[in-house]
Amino acid sequence: MTAFSEILQRRDWENPQSVNIHCLKAHSPLASFRDMAHARDGIHAQRQSLNGQWKFKLFDAPEQVDGQFTQADFNDAEWDEIPVPSNWQLHGYDKPIYANIKYPFDVNPPFVPRENPTGCYRTRVSLSPEDLLNTQRIIFDGVNSAFHLWCNGTWVGYSQDSRLPAEFDLTSHLVAGENTLAVMVMRWCDGSYLEDQDMWWLSGIFRDVTLLSKPQHCIEDVFITPDLDACYRDGSLSIVTTIAAPETYQVQVQLFEGTQAVTEPNIDRPHNRRIDERGTWNDVVFQTLHLREPKKWTAETPNLYRLVVSLLDENGTHLESEAYPVGFRKVEISEGQLKLNGKPLLIRGVNRHEHHPELGHVMTEEDMIRDICLMKQYNFNAVRTAHYPNHPRWYELCDQYGLYVCDEANIETHGMQPMSRLSSDPQWAHAYMSRYTQMVLRDKNHPSIIIWSLGNESGHGSNHNAMYAWSKNFDPSRPVQYEGGGSNTTATDIIAPMYARVNTLIADEAVPKWPIKKWISLPNETRPLILCEYAHAMGNSLGSFDEYWAAFREFPRLQGGFIWDWVDQGLSQWDENGQHFWAYGGDFGDEINDRQFCINGLIFPDRTVHPTLQEAKYCQRMITVSLQEQTQKACTLLVTNENLFRATDNEQLNWSLLENGQVIQTGSLALSVEADSQTRLEIALNFTPKAQAQYHLNTDICLIEATSWAPAGHVVATEQMALRNHAGLAIPTLRTQPAPKLTQDGHAIVVSSLDEKHQWRWDSQSGLLMEWNVDGKAQMLAAPQDNFFRAPLDNDIGISEVDNVDPNAWVCRWEMAGIGQWERHCVHCDSETLAHTVVVTTTFAYHFGGDVQAITQWTHTLSNDGEMLLDVDVTLADTLPPMPRIGLELQLPLYQADTPITWQGLGPFENYPDRLAAARFGLHTQTLAQMHTPYIFPTDSGLRCGTQWLQVNELAISGDFQFSVSQYAQQQLAEAKHTHDLLAQERIYLRLDHQHMGVGGDDSWSPSVHKEFQLTEKHYRYQLRFKPASR
């Protein structure tokens, strides 16, 4: 018996050689069905969940734990209770820590802080005498970071690697009746140096705990390898079964589709294959099944069979069965491309952390299904388990629903210097190998897994080479990818860079990131390129995403990538007023933190979607539509089906014809396009074109019937095509109305319509339009003013670490130029009456640091009918950096909380100049609240581009502009750190932009806005026409 004091003295949690003690060898998940039919149907598994309320107490360090807590008779009545699974930091113990790169403790591997929060758990399990006739194994699917286990006061063993199962044989420790389990979990261990992923540091038993009952003679492991013949028609299944039984026992394998057997039973014994010059295995059975023309598994067609593996004694009596879903598919790299079933894949992927806003790292099945359905609804076909093996159920669901998986080992040493320090250290080789091999051994039977990953951001060293070599020997059916060390080392079958650009080199003397187009053309480089991370979706981001997809579709060896990342890692918190907000790094008093750098998702923590997800859905669409030919009476469309393995047998094309953004004709067409092919469709048009009207054809590809992941009617792909107007031009009408009345009263310039219905008043000293009344009702609450500032986006701030601010970041450059702090002076303000209008001209100079930074001239042309034509001329100093925006801001009255905003332009969702591929021109209406995107870290949001007409309240504006509306002042948005810091104002801020800089998004730590979306010109001119909406 190992004494508690000996365990404390031994300090397994600071020894990289002590990865696990007394753990059973890793294997595919086991269920121990006692009947073949039960195995086939997946019912009555011999697994007992130990999830529930456990006794719990947190200590400051292992040395402070009372070793008597391991004993069955220990009095835990005063202890708290905590749910298992859970993270203890989310139940009032200790605090969450978020860091991207930095370790939250002093770096001195393998040692960890002496102040090492230690959670002690206790629970009781009752077993009958009949239960003890079988072996009893306990399985911890995930414990962070390391733990010791006792049963009835006896030490059982130790394990670390928080993302893989730890399984112990409890049989010899159990008694009939009540049994006591005690677990001591350390927050930090030497393994923490290998788990420096960009996520929350949370602790505890956070995945399921299960008791597995198996007979004395049983199946220990099953390794299934599907294959297809050279024509990808017929299938074979290699089955390698490891047993704990006499050599005379037999293994039977049989394949089912539903309840129907599709192969005959195949029965064999150990010693049936010679391995080397010393002979055969005495506990391994090799078998092969063949199936003619099986239904193939792909993400598009996730056809599954079920393999039942049974152990029979020498008399043929059934003892136990295990069963696994089987997907017939073949993964290979040939001709420089990653292929599935002979077809080159295009990876529409995303990196996904296991994150829940209330449960932390605990994921329920419902959460997993919701993520998968959202991914498929938004045209993702692949997921990278960033950066660790996921919950076992995740892979079963990916098999079932259809997602390609890049399964990643729980290894990241991002905070080491150099990053490869541990990766090149032989003392850590065992820890590396254990993490990788146990992942592969657990997950090897899942058809959804098409790529193994050696880990993330750990440099490149001999330990990676060892993992790669083992993988290629153990499972040659799957490629291996790894980004570290430059993305193209000998330890990867796929060039797998992070954040490489399409056309721009990111220079680094150690690990240069070539433009992806160039990378595949480097000398002697024949591998496919799949970005393991790209398009950093932090806040208001994903600019120029369409540029990647144009490259992916143009160059066959550019095979897509995995967006970073899926979900904002915000944790639910409430302020002192009971207002909810999403917390990020530093919000829990965690002094080492990287603030909001964990808020990188395409969706919010509660799974509502960001506008960026619309852009991803559009660019990744599986079915594209393009206009091939147009006459006055018809349009010919080319429909391309990028699905590689299924025809459009459950889709229809709904179309609508728009005139000036309004629908005037609709229709539907049956859609029948074979996989990976094209067809032409003709749409008959029945309308008379109007002079100078704009016409667009919208197409929506919709599901006819519901699928497992989306309801009937779900739109899988959209398109909008501009049509030519076959009508002639309209003759313009000339104004014949008299000019309005101009008067001056001291410093006031007053312009009124002859019927006194419309009135404008300027202050000639400030040059500002102070009042605009219609029928005595104020149209504005504050004067329109030049607007050059935007509340900085995460990409503008450009940091990945709190103490690593880049002076070249946009926000730093803007602050240096004083943008948002300029002092305005009116140079002059003039007015004159013309034949039909009154013109008021004001000139402003903007000063900062003793210099004039900008000069603007506003020319207001006022008509008797209440119309105001505003012409703005902007000149900027040559010394200024690219500007955030060129435009103006007004403040309007707020009459109702759900004020409708109607516009003719791109929408309906938020779009920016470099993120508008998915937006469509039309006449849109949304409420004021819908026009604001509540980014967790408040920033500029809600822009709509390509606008020609806008109505807010009783004011209509026309021109060619971009706009946003909000109840928050820009300074509020710039200063707020969370949404609960924002107090909605009793007014509407209307921002009208002539030009607005792009949002960027190739990454979030460098100025990533592409040149064509930067405002580098020094002269701008624009016009806006204002009029009462009632006209």
From Swiss-Prot:
GO terms for molecular function: beta-galactosidase activity; carbohydrate binding; magnesium ion binding. The active site is at E457 (proton donor), E533 (nucleophile). Its cofactor is Mg(2+); Na(+). The keyword Chloroplast does not apply. Its EC number is 3.2.1.23. Mg(2+) 2 binds at N593. The record marks H353, H387 as: Transition state stabilizer. It is an enzyme of class 3 (hydrolase). Keywords: Glycosidase, Hydrolase, Magnesium, Metal-binding, Sodium. One of its GO terms (biological process) is lactose catabolic process. The keyword Magnesium applies. Binds 2 magnesium ions per monomer. Binds 1 sodium ion per monomer. PROSITE patterns: GLYCOSYL_HYDROL_F2_2. PANTHER family: BETA-GALACTOSIDASE. This is Beta-galactosidase.
